[in-house]
Amino acid sequence: MGPAGSALSSGQMQMQMVLWGSLAAVAMFFLITFLILLCSSCDRDKKPRQHSGDHESLMNVPSDKEMFSHSATSLTTDALASSEQNGVLTNGDILSEDSTMTCMQHYEEVQTSASDLLDSQDSTGKAKCHQSRELPRIPPENAVDAMLTARAADGDSGPGVEGPYEVLKDSSSQENMVEDCLYETVKEIKEVADKSQGGKSKSTSALKELQGAHAEGKADFAEYASVDRNKKCRHSTNAESILGTSSDLDEETPPPVPVKLLDENANLPEKGEHGAEEQAPEAPSGHSKRFSSLSYKSREEDPTLTEEEISAMYSSVNKPGQSAHKPGPESTCQCPQGPPQRSSSSCNDLYATVKDFEKTPNSISMLPPARRPGEEPEPDYEAIQTLNREDDKVPLGTNGHLVPKENDYESIGDLQQGRDVTRL
């Protein structure tokens, strides 16, 4: 039993050793795989950390716009920024010819002097080179902005204005505003003209009747727009139009024209009779005053008229003189030389001459003694009555037919026909 038992025990020991060896091998395998997984995870963790660090470094590096965003007129250049504009070189950076050319171009742009910048602009502050895009124009919102724009237009740079771009913006906006306000539309001026001529339709109609084509020429002023270079913006134009409408209308409207000139001319015979009733000897002086005033008005309307034409145009008929030269049935004064002189001096009995005017005071002064033996105590009044009666008889001609009523003014055609006769 001894050797058999020892053999069994040795077989069991071998089985145990195989089992423990296999267990150890399996354990070692699992341990190695676990360590490999741990190492791979560590490698994976390290790789994203390196990439994130590179990304953060790239984001912290200033861009090209930030590197060259300083004022263009400053002469100082940043050497450090120009030398380190691309940042620190890393393994992933690739240098090419394009990148080097862009770096050199930026460096040359920084090295330009203020004299070159001033040469690139003309006297008005406008760049000579063509720009690809148009700068925005912001209208002034308050008085401070308006003062700044006016100062920039005059050439005085404000406290916060730097560089050529601000100057270009201000000059272009100012030019556009001035160009917008140079010309006014015809519609606006027609509206103003309608307002000014709304309450004066009667005066304009009388003006057209009296002046004719002259008034029509003045009425056409609303067809063209006026140009005012002193106005700098539409707001100032509107303000001036609102505030100065009354003054402009008063200045533009012509002086009032007397509308009742025709009525006065039609009523002149009645006024002449009343004047003769009050003071008969002073009638020629009153007529001469009236002639001088009318000739003055005609000279204003047409300065080319001469004194002779004006006097011929406004020569009137003295009715007391006509009746005084004609012998009446009730008057005792006989003037045998009156009718032949009148026929020789004028072509008919409707017109009076200078000789008749000169003789009218004598004839009128001779009438009152003729009526003194009468019944009425006022001989002057009776003499004027007889004159009026004789005036009523004047339209009846020698042949018995009616003569058209005479006018106070002679027509130009009759004057031209009878000029040689009246000068005798």
From Swiss-Prot:
Phosphoserine occurs at which residues?
Answer: 52, 63, 157, 226, 346
What does the UniProt record tell us about how this protein is modified after translation?
Palmitoylated.
Question: What are the lipidation residues for S-palmitoyl cysteine?
Answer: 39, 42
Extracellular face residues: 1-17
- Cytoplasmic compartment segments: 39-424
CC per GO annotation: membrane raft; plasma membrane
- Spell out the residue ranges making up region: Interaction with NHERF1: 422-424
Q: Where is the composition biased (Polar residues)?
A: 236-247, 331-347
User: What GO molecular function terms would the record report?
Assistant: SH2 domain binding; transmembrane receptor protein tyrosine kinase adaptor activity
What keyword terms does UniProt attach to this protein?
Adaptive immunity, Cell membrane, Immunity, Lipoprotein, Membrane, Palmitate, Phosphoprotein, Signal-anchor, Transmembrane, Transmembrane helix
Ranges of compositional bias, category Basic and acidic residues: 215-230
Briefly state the protein's biological role: Negatively regulates TCR (T-cell antigen receptor)-mediated signaling in T-cells and FCER1 (high affinity immunoglobulin epsilon receptor)-mediated signaling in mast cells. Promotes CSK activation and recruitment to lipid rafts, which results in LCK inhibition. Inhibits immunological synapse formation by preventing dynamic arrangement of lipid raft proteins. May be involved in cell adhesion signaling.
UniProt-recorded name of the protein: Phosphoprotein associated with glycosphingolipid-enriched microdomains 1
Q: Which gene is this protein's source? A: Pag1
